Amino acid sequence: MNKQSEKLAKAIAYEAKKKKERDEDKRPAFHVTPTTGWCNDPNGFSRFGEEYHLFYQYYPYENKWGPMHWGHCRTKDFIKWEELPCALAPDMEYDGQGCFSGTAVEHEGKHILMYTSVLEKDLEDGTHMVRQTQSIAIGDGENYEKVTENPVITADCLPEGSSPVDFRDPKIWKEDGRFYALIGSKAEDGSGQLALFTSEDALHWNYEKMIDQCKNRYGKMWECPDFFALDGCQVLIVSPQFMRAEGLEFHNGNNSIYFTGDYEKETMTYTRGDARQVDYGMDFYAPQTVETTD
């Protein structure tokens, strides 16, 4: 997969130029940092082959937020990280305003990235349209190509009242021969909810149900969900916007919280307990987990 759009080629060339100019002695020795420019959410944290890949929200051209790309690096030991070329650029109509957050999974020797594609445009009636959809790119660990089926999931299949503007951050995983995706959504009252989808091929998806709804109990929009089994429990991590403080908890506004609960796979039913903070710092948001070989 060596196809590169003009925007992606431009980003990769800019990275190469800035790498020659930067002072390596001033870069962190262990922490992942962008090749150049801006980064925020970690994306696509996953095992592929014998290595672990980490992508991130990325704007290479300035030290501030801009149209989101996906930066890329990999490691074998989580100490030494190898920088790789920019993996995704906002180069299609459906993602022209950004390749927002997402996750990744290995399948049959290929690395599948699932991300939120953002479209904005002015309509003939004078209104401004924003749409967040979900898209797929498939690669070999270094080069990735967006599929012709994109966007593979839109908000059209969601329950009435669900926002097509706030529909993002897919968590993709594979289990028992099927693909699953858990995606953040906003209900009509502005509260967060999590939509569950299934697929046989990661390209054609079926909406199953809202697996959880916060009903304004824990903030508003739930961003960047993570969902995994741990020590006999099913853990759900979300990053709610506009959390209200409760006693000594949730004082950082936009938090990352986790629930432990039970998940019934046959009925796709999740029963959760109370929320706990993942971290009490002011700058901790949108974490991702990966299952290692040990």
Residue positions per predicted region:
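Beta-rich carbohydrate-recognition and catalytic domains
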Residues: 1-169, 174-219, 229-281, 294
